[in-house]
Amino acid sequence: IINIFCEKDDRIKPVFLEKNIGPSGARNIAMQKSSGRYIAFLDSDDVWDPYKLEKQISFMEYNNIAFSYTGYQVISEDGNIRNSIIKVPALITYHDYLKNTIIGCLTVILDKTQIGDLKMPDIRTSQDMAFWLLILRNGFSAYGLNESLAKYRVVRDSNSSNKIRAVKDVWFVYREIERLNLFYSLWCFINYIFYALKKRIL
């Protein structure tokens, strides 16, 4: 399938890995080898709106934004929509994101000329959460385009479908990656649970 698309568009440059190096390793290699200005993320089971890149990059260029994200919807394994549009705030800072991990990886676009050569932390899960925090901790803010431009597919037995594992991973990022003290970790965690429940209910 990849070769078919490569024949149609020479801008597509596949990178084949000899062994499984995990999501963060694969994404870091892809970012390193990319020659364009903008970086976007899309896993094989997720879906973009046909005009996502055009709309989002125009939004970034007009506002001189380094880090942007959009709204999205969650779909089931067979493609049925599971909830309403997940609306996103216009701005997220480092401390905002610690409490509300609403940024969907499949919606993010980064401007490499501003972000630089930051790498996704090499951890087992929640690599994207740790990466967004790394960028935000380096002085950037993330800006939201409140329009549903992607669909996130929840696959059975995946990390995202395992809520207990997800909760443990968030706590791991707080304590082991961000080195937050216990009390601030608890405060952020309470907020994280609140926003996670709110996202599932609405």
Predicted features along the sequence, with ranges:
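Acidic donor-binding segment of Leloir-type glycosyltransferases
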Residues: I1-F16
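Glycine-rich, basic loop-to-helix element that forms the pyrophosphate-binding segment
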Residues: L17-S34
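Conserved donor sugar-nucleotide recognition element shared by glycan-biosynthetic enzymes
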Residues: P23, R27, K52, L106
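Conserved nucleotide-sugar donor-binding catalytic segment
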Residues: Q32, V88-R165, D169, V173
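Short aromatic/hydrophobic "clamp" motif used to bind/position activated sugar donors
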Residues: I39
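The conserved acidic donor/metal-binding loop of glycosyltransferases
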Residues: D43-V47, G71
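Conserved donor NDP-sugar-binding/catalytic core segment of glycosyltransferases
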Residues: Y51-R82
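Hydrophobic helical membrane-anchoring modules
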Residues: K151-L202
